[in-house]
């Protein structure tokens, strides 16, 4: 293969059969269970990178079911998102996500900088409640429940919340092990079509694990729970801060 061909074809590895396709990345009937809880502010300060700022000691614990996604297929994801501000702009910082499908793990890490790891999350309706779980190996590290569709939420308000900015810390090492990419990335969910939004009584239990440390941000109080279904496009990102250029 000629050098010019390598340059023109290079998108993702392997060169001749990339682990994920080019976008746009559209999700149909993407389903969220988001349980917001109050946690230890000191622990948040230890893990949220500057220049992001913590506004309140809150965490969104998310279980996300994605049965129909462009190029990524059928998978489920779970993890923690922390409400933050960047230059006065409110958004969410994704701390870690755990999922069961290789293409979105590879694409998420390489394109945007999503902190994704392989695990076994689930999200489904269990009789009268919606149930989310996360297993890392053989250990159950997260269990979330919410009463099924107890009360409608305002669709327009929830669409605005989904459309807000999200922040990622993208880290890619050089071949010698030093940092080659260390950037704060901002991205948005786009073309959102809300199909439903509900709330109800909720619970969240987190268990310690050395490699899936969701319990390092302890649950002190449940603040809010939301069950959302929407079609949306996962927009590509932009670098808002380059740690290596400072």
Curated annotation (Swiss-Prot):
Catalytic activity: acetoacetate + H(+) = acetone + CO2
Active-site residues, record numbering mapped to chain: 116
Intrachain disulfide bonds: none
Highest taxon of source: Bacteria
Enzyme class, broadest EC rank: lyase
InterPro entries: Acetoacetate_decarboxylase, Acetoacetate_decarboxylase_bac, ADC_dom_sf
Enzyme nomenclature, EC number: 4.1.1.4
GO molecular function list: acetoacetate decarboxylase activity
Keywords on record: Decarboxylase, Lyase, Schiff base
Family, as annotated: Belongs to the ADC family.
UniProt cross-references to HAMAP family, sorted A to Z: ADC (MF_00597)
Entry function: Catalyzes the conversion of acetoacetate to acetone and carbon dioxide.
Protein name: Acetoacetate decarboxylase
Species whose genome carries this gene: Burkholderia ambifaria (strain MC40-6)
Taxonomic placement: Bacteria, Pseudomonadati, Pseudomonadota, Betaproteobacteria, Burkholderiales
The gene coding this protein: adc
